[in-house]
Amino acid sequence: MCMVIFAPLFAIFAFATCGGYSGGLRLSVDCVNKTESNLSIDIAFAYPFRLHQVTFEVPTCEGKERQKLALIGDSSSSAEFFVTVAVFAFLYSLAATVVYIFFQNKYRENNRGPLIDFIVTVVFSFLWLVGSSAWAKGLSDVKVATDPKEVLLLMSACKQPSNKCMAIHSPVMSSLNTSVVFGFLNFILWAGNIWFVFKETGWHSSGQRYLSDPMEKHSSSYNQGGYNQDSYGSSSGYSQQASLGPTSDEFGQQPTGPTSFTNQI
């Protein structure tokens, strides 16, 4: 039940916080010649974080000449893979919820539904682990590439001590951090559901039968051996008890000598 409720929600939070992100930073370059300064340089970037395609112009503080720069890095592969896994996990969890509720008989027919569900759950657990780990590394690269201090190092005007370069504000990465958290939460949720799905498959029931058959055989052989021992003991005890009493011959034997003193006379 937890899987039905939380899997679609966690998947939505994962791809929404990552795929819907857009942010930026603002820098300022104050040249010695104030007419050449630019105190508001806005650099915007968004999903899928192809930062090498994000270009911007900054003053060189050498006349009216301007320098065209671009951010460094490309984290699009890890970000797109993460969002793709989240979208497909959301769609599958919705479809599985509909099947669980409305097509329970079809789901358990020939044990095909539980087997498919088990395989898909294992696959998505692996994909969530790989996707979340890759996106965590990609997010780390995005943070470094969009750090205002790193961007200022790209500007030739900022290498001259007479010019003043500073960051006005940095990009907000809280939603991207949340996406990584939800990615690993999805992995924990799907991996924890593997055992519950496995219990519904025929593999689990066949394994239990395989373990119970030798135990039943062992217990039946033990009971049979105990019965034979009891039978043997009761029969031997009966023979011993029968041999304790006197025989009919012993009771029937008459004395051969005289029975009275008068007869002797």
UniProtKB/Swiss-Prot annotation:
Main localisation: membrane
Residue segments, region 5 X approximate repeats: 210-242
Chain segments carrying region Disordered: 221-265
Cytoplasmic side: 1-4, 103-114, 199-265
PROSITE patterns: MARVEL, SYNAPTOP
Record topology, Vesicular segments: 26-81, 136-177
The MARVEL domain, residue ranges: 1-202
Stretches that traverse the bilayer: 5-25, 82-102, 115-135, 178-198
InterPro entries in UniProt: Marvel, Synaptophysin/porin
Residues where Phosphoserine is found: S212
Family of the protein in this entry: Belongs to the synaptophysin/synaptobrevin family.
PANTHER family registered for this protein in UniProt: SYNAPTOPHYSIN, SYNAPTOPORIN
Function (record text): Intrinsic membrane protein of small synaptic vesicles. Probable vesicular channel protein.
Protein name: Synaptoporin
